[in-house]
């Protein structure tokens, strides 16, 4: 079981990397400007691909933000939110965290509680990232961030992002968390 699951994750990773290598650098002026304002020790590269349907980040030492070619480069508000979301993943080293989640799942492949933990931990990573984006861009912008997520999901899936045959889906859960977000005061942290 351990080897089969490790093999599955490894093959998925290698296939994805092969797809990602076919991407091209994205030199949109707004993206270059955004990168200059958000520099960290590790150089971040932004690339574009027509083989993906939603933005993602890969790489640890040389992180890359990969954007779908269909993403409107003229919508600077959406670009800001997308880039900031992926930037938070990079700053927090979420790639390492996700590798650790997968390693624990490989070792404890037989335990259904660990499978549940894997799903919930990945969900919580996204929810936490959304909370950081709201902190960075301002609580007053949370509705426009939520709207951008809905629009991106609708473009990706071709149907309403809030519709699901089986109840709540991940996007509607994220939207709900974004809209309920409240900035924690210093006094609340002290208590």
Across the structure, where does each feature detected by a protein language model lie?
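Membrane-embedded and juxtamembrane structural elements of multi-pass membrane proteins
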Residues: 1-191
């Amino acid at each position: 079981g351990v080897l089969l699951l490790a093999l599955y994750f490894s093959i998925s990773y290698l296939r994805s990397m092969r797809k990602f290598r076919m991407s091209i650098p994205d030199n949109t002026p707004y993206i270059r400007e955004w990168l200059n304002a958000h520099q960290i020790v590790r150089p971040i590269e932004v690339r574009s691909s027509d083989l993906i349907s939603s933005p993602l980040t890969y790489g640890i030492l040389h992180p890359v933000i990969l954007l779908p070619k269909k993403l409107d480069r003229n919508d600077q508000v959406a670009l800001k939110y997308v880039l900031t979301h992926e930037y938070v993943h990079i700053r927090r080293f979420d790639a390492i965290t996700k590798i650790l989640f997968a390693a624990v799942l490989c070792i404890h492949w037989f335990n259904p509680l660990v499978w549940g933990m894997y799903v919930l931990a990945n969900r919580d990573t996204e929810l936490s990232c959304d909370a950081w984006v709201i902190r960075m861009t301002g609580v007053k912008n949370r509705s426009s961030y939520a709207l951008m997520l809905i629009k991106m999901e609708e473009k990706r899936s071709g149907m309403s992002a809030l519709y699901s045959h089986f109840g709540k889906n991940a996007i509607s859960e994220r939207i709900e968390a974004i809209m309920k977000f409240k900035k924690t005061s210093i006094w609340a942290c002290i208590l």
